[in-house]
Amino acid sequence: MALLGLAVAAVAAYAAQAGVSSGGGRCATYRPHIPSHSQFSKVIDNPYFPLPAGRTLIYRGVENGRKELDRVHVTSRTKRIEGISATVVDDNVYEPIGRLAERTFDYYAQDDRRNVWYLGEDTREFLPGGKVDTSGSWLTGRNGAKPGLIMEADPRVSDAYRQECRSGEAEDLAWVVDRGGSNRVPYRTFHHVLRSLEFSRLEPAIVDQKVYGPGVGAISERQLSGGHETLSLVRVTG
Protein backbone atom coordinates (compact mmCIF):
# COMPACT_ATOMS: atom_id res chain seq x y z
CA MET A 1 0.00 0.00 0.00
CA ALA A 2 2.83 2.39 0.78
CA LEU A 3 4.36 1.87 -2.66
CA LEU A 4 1.02 2.47 -4.34
CA GLY A 5 0.75 5.73 -2.43
CA LEU A 6 4.20 6.69 -3.64
CA ALA A 7 3.16 5.90 -7.20
CA VAL A 8 0.27 8.34 -7.03
CA ALA A 9 2.57 10.96 -5.53
CA ALA A 10 5.09 10.32 -8.30
CA VAL A 11 2.56 11.02 -11.03
CA ALA A 12 1.50 14.27 -9.38
CA ALA A 13 5.09 15.33 -8.65
CA TYR A 14 6.28 14.69 -12.17
CA ALA A 15 3.29 16.45 -13.72
CA ALA A 16 4.10 19.52 -11.63
CA GLN A 17 7.81 19.31 -12.43
CA ALA A 18 7.28 18.94 -16.17
CA GLY A 19 4.59 21.59 -16.36
CA VAL A 20 1.95 19.30 -17.83
CA SER A 21 -1.30 17.90 -16.55
CA SER A 22 -2.28 14.25 -16.82
CA GLY A 23 -4.67 15.12 -19.63
CA GLY A 24 -2.75 17.96 -21.24
CA GLY A 25 -0.25 18.65 -23.96
CA ARG A 26 2.25 16.11 -22.67
CA CYS A 27 5.12 15.86 -25.19
CA ALA A 28 4.43 19.26 -26.74
CA THR A 29 5.70 21.02 -23.62
CA TYR A 30 8.51 18.58 -22.84
CA ARG A 31 11.94 20.01 -23.68
CA PRO A 32 14.75 17.61 -22.79
CA HIS A 33 18.26 19.03 -22.50
CA ILE A 34 19.93 16.77 -25.05
CA PRO A 35 23.75 16.95 -25.14
CA SER A 36 25.48 17.70 -28.43
CA HIS A 37 26.53 14.78 -30.63
CA SER A 38 30.14 15.12 -29.50
CA GLN A 39 29.10 14.60 -25.88
CA PHE A 40 27.94 11.02 -26.43
CA SER A 41 30.30 8.12 -25.77
CA LYS A 42 30.80 4.95 -27.79
CA VAL A 43 30.09 2.67 -24.84
CA ILE A 44 27.28 2.37 -22.32
CA ASP A 45 28.78 1.58 -18.92
CA ASN A 46 26.38 3.23 -16.48
CA PRO A 47 26.55 0.92 -13.41
CA TYR A 48 22.77 0.49 -13.28
CA PHE A 49 22.28 0.14 -17.05
CA PRO A 50 25.43 -1.27 -18.70
CA LEU A 51 25.09 -2.50 -22.27
CA PRO A 52 28.29 -4.25 -23.37
CA ALA A 53 28.01 -5.70 -26.88
CA GLY A 54 27.33 -9.43 -26.83
CA ARG A 55 25.67 -9.57 -23.43
CA THR A 56 22.44 -11.56 -23.10
CA LEU A 57 20.09 -11.42 -20.13
CA ILE A 58 17.38 -14.04 -19.57
CA TYR A 59 14.34 -13.36 -17.42
CA ARG A 60 11.55 -15.69 -16.39
CA GLY A 61 8.21 -14.80 -14.89
CA VAL A 62 4.44 -14.97 -15.00
CA GLU A 63 1.90 -12.64 -16.57
CA ASN A 64 -1.75 -13.10 -15.63
CA GLY A 65 -1.17 -16.78 -14.87
CA ARG A 66 0.92 -17.58 -17.96
CA LYS A 67 4.64 -18.31 -17.83
CA GLU A 68 6.85 -16.07 -19.92
CA LEU A 69 10.50 -15.77 -20.88
CA ASP A 70 12.23 -12.53 -21.86
CA ARG A 71 15.54 -12.65 -23.73
CA VAL A 72 17.40 -9.33 -23.98
CA HIS A 73 20.48 -9.27 -26.23
CA VAL A 74 22.86 -6.33 -26.68
CA THR A 75 23.85 -6.40 -30.33
CA SER A 76 27.04 -5.00 -31.83
CA ARG A 77 24.94 -2.91 -34.22
CA THR A 78 24.27 0.80 -33.96
CA LYS A 79 21.58 3.04 -35.42
CA ARG A 80 22.11 6.72 -36.13
CA ILE A 81 19.25 8.77 -34.73
CA GLU A 82 19.31 12.55 -35.08
CA GLY A 83 23.08 12.36 -35.48
CA ILE A 84 23.58 10.20 -32.38
CA SER A 85 24.97 6.66 -32.63
CA ALA A 86 22.63 4.44 -30.61
CA THR A 87 23.24 0.89 -29.39
CA VAL A 88 20.66 -1.60 -30.67
CA VAL A 89 19.17 -3.99 -28.10
CA ASP A 90 17.08 -6.95 -29.29
CA ASP A 91 14.33 -7.84 -26.78
CA ASN A 92 12.24 -11.00 -27.35
CA VAL A 93 9.30 -12.00 -25.16
CA TYR A 94 8.00 -15.57 -25.31
CA GLU A 95 4.53 -16.18 -23.88
CA PRO A 96 3.77 -18.93 -23.32
CA ILE A 97 7.37 -20.09 -23.32
CA GLY A 98 8.19 -21.29 -26.83
CA ARG A 99 5.95 -18.83 -28.71
CA LEU A 100 7.38 -15.47 -29.70
CA ALA A 101 4.81 -12.94 -28.50
CA GLU A 102 6.71 -9.70 -28.95
CA ARG A 103 9.98 -8.49 -30.46
CA THR A 104 11.39 -5.04 -29.86
CA PHE A 105 14.53 -3.24 -30.99
CA ASP A 106 15.42 -0.59 -28.42
CA TYR A 107 17.87 2.25 -29.09
CA TYR A 108 20.07 3.67 -26.32
CA ALA A 109 22.99 6.10 -26.10
CA GLN A 110 25.10 7.34 -23.18
CA ASP A 111 26.36 10.89 -22.79
CA ASP A 112 29.76 11.76 -21.33
CA ARG A 113 28.22 12.21 -17.87
CA ARG A 114 26.95 8.58 -18.06
CA ASN A 115 23.27 9.40 -18.38
CA VAL A 116 21.67 6.75 -20.60
CA TRP A 117 19.20 8.15 -23.12
CA TYR A 118 16.34 6.22 -24.69
CA LEU A 119 16.09 7.29 -28.34
CA GLY A 120 13.32 5.03 -29.59
CA GLU A 121 12.03 1.55 -30.24
CA ASP A 122 10.62 -0.55 -33.04
CA THR A 123 8.19 -3.00 -31.50
CA ARG A 124 6.05 -5.78 -32.94
CA GLU A 125 3.47 -7.76 -31.01
CA PHE A 126 2.43 -10.98 -32.73
CA LEU A 127 -1.33 -11.49 -32.41
CA PRO A 128 -3.58 -14.46 -33.25
CA GLY A 129 -4.37 -14.86 -36.92
CA GLY A 130 -0.99 -13.63 -38.05
CA LYS A 131 -1.69 -9.99 -37.20
CA VAL A 132 1.13 -7.73 -36.03
CA ASP A 133 0.64 -4.72 -33.76
CA THR A 134 3.34 -2.04 -33.95
CA SER A 135 1.72 0.47 -31.61
CA GLY A 136 4.18 1.82 -29.08
CA SER A 137 6.92 2.24 -31.68
CA TRP A 138 8.61 5.63 -31.77
CA LEU A 139 11.83 7.28 -32.86
CA THR A 140 13.36 10.55 -31.72
CA GLY A 141 12.74 13.26 -34.30
CA ARG A 142 9.75 11.59 -35.95
CA ASN A 143 6.15 12.65 -35.40
CA GLY A 144 7.11 14.90 -32.53
CA ALA A 145 8.84 12.14 -30.54
CA LYS A 146 11.54 13.18 -28.06
CA PRO A 147 14.10 11.14 -26.13
CA GLY A 148 14.01 10.42 -22.43
CA LEU A 149 16.35 9.04 -19.80
CA ILE A 150 16.31 5.32 -19.14
CA MET A 151 18.89 5.74 -16.36
CA GLU A 152 20.47 8.79 -14.75
CA ALA A 153 24.20 9.00 -14.16
CA ASP A 154 23.65 9.39 -10.42
CA PRO A 155 20.03 8.48 -9.62
CA ARG A 156 18.75 9.81 -6.32
CA VAL A 157 15.65 9.05 -4.30
CA SER A 158 12.73 11.28 -5.41
CA ASP A 159 14.18 11.89 -8.90
CA ALA A 160 11.41 11.76 -11.51
CA TYR A 161 11.91 11.78 -15.27
CA ARG A 162 10.43 10.86 -18.62
CA GLN A 163 11.80 7.74 -20.25
CA GLU A 164 10.20 8.35 -23.63
CA CYS A 165 7.86 10.84 -25.21
CA ARG A 166 5.63 10.48 -28.23
CA SER A 167 2.12 11.67 -27.43
CA GLY A 168 -0.42 8.86 -27.54
CA GLU A 169 2.18 6.17 -28.24
CA ALA A 170 5.05 6.25 -25.74
CA GLU A 171 4.75 8.14 -22.47
CA ASP A 172 6.59 6.12 -19.82
CA LEU A 173 7.86 7.84 -16.68
CA ALA A 174 10.02 6.72 -13.76
CA TRP A 175 10.37 7.78 -10.13
CA VAL A 176 13.30 6.64 -7.99
CA VAL A 177 12.03 5.40 -4.61
CA ASP A 178 15.06 3.69 -3.07
CA ARG A 179 18.79 3.26 -3.53
CA GLY A 180 20.62 0.77 -1.36
CA GLY A 181 19.73 -2.53 0.21
CA SER A 182 19.80 -5.98 -1.33
CA ASN A 183 17.64 -8.02 -3.67
CA ARG A 184 17.81 -11.73 -4.39
CA VAL A 185 16.83 -13.15 -7.78
CA PRO A 186 17.47 -16.62 -9.23
CA TYR A 187 20.68 -15.41 -10.88
CA ARG A 188 22.24 -14.21 -7.59
CA THR A 189 21.91 -11.70 -4.76
CA PHE A 190 22.62 -8.05 -5.56
CA HIS A 191 23.58 -5.33 -3.10
CA HIS A 192 23.25 -1.53 -3.40
CA VAL A 193 20.27 -1.95 -5.73
CA LEU A 194 18.16 0.83 -7.22
CA ARG A 195 14.35 0.69 -7.06
CA SER A 196 12.01 2.74 -9.19
CA LEU A 197 8.31 2.95 -9.89
CA GLU A 198 7.54 3.09 -13.60
CA PHE A 199 4.22 4.01 -15.17
CA SER A 200 2.62 5.56 -18.25
CA ARG A 201 0.12 8.34 -18.76
CA LEU A 202 -1.49 6.07 -21.35
CA GLU A 203 -2.21 3.35 -18.76
CA PRO A 204 -2.39 5.20 -15.43
CA ALA A 205 -3.80 2.18 -13.57
CA ILE A 206 -0.62 0.17 -14.18
CA VAL A 207 2.35 0.73 -11.88
CA ASP A 208 5.52 -1.40 -12.05
CA GLN A 209 8.31 -1.67 -9.53
CA LYS A 210 11.69 -2.30 -11.17
CA VAL A 211 14.92 -3.20 -9.42
CA TYR A 212 18.34 -2.54 -10.95
CA GLY A 213 21.56 -4.25 -9.83
CA PRO A 214 25.02 -2.69 -10.19
CA GLY A 215 26.99 -4.09 -13.11
CA VAL A 216 24.00 -5.81 -14.70
CA GLY A 217 20.98 -3.52 -15.00
CA ALA A 218 17.37 -4.62 -14.55
CA ILE A 219 17.14 -7.68 -12.29
CA SER A 220 13.44 -7.85 -11.46
CA GLU A 221 10.07 -6.33 -12.27
CA ARG A 222 6.77 -6.61 -10.44
CA GLN A 223 3.42 -5.12 -11.33
CA LEU A 224 1.97 -3.42 -8.26
CA SER A 225 -1.37 -2.45 -9.78
CA GLY A 226 -3.35 -2.92 -12.97
CA GLY A 227 -2.42 -6.57 -13.53
CA HIS A 228 -0.31 -9.46 -12.38
CA GLU A 229 3.18 -9.74 -13.85
CA THR A 230 6.55 -10.64 -12.38
CA LEU A 231 9.95 -11.08 -14.04
CA SER A 232 13.27 -12.08 -12.49
CA LEU A 233 16.77 -12.40 -13.90
CA VAL A 234 17.87 -16.03 -14.19
CA ARG A 235 20.97 -15.92 -16.41
CA VAL A 236 23.56 -13.54 -17.84
CA THR A 237 26.08 -14.35 -20.56
CA GLY A 238 28.62 -12.18 -22.34
Write out the residue ranges for each language-model feature.
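Conserved functional acidic sites
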Residues: 14, 19-238
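Secretory targeting and sorting signals
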Residues: 1-18
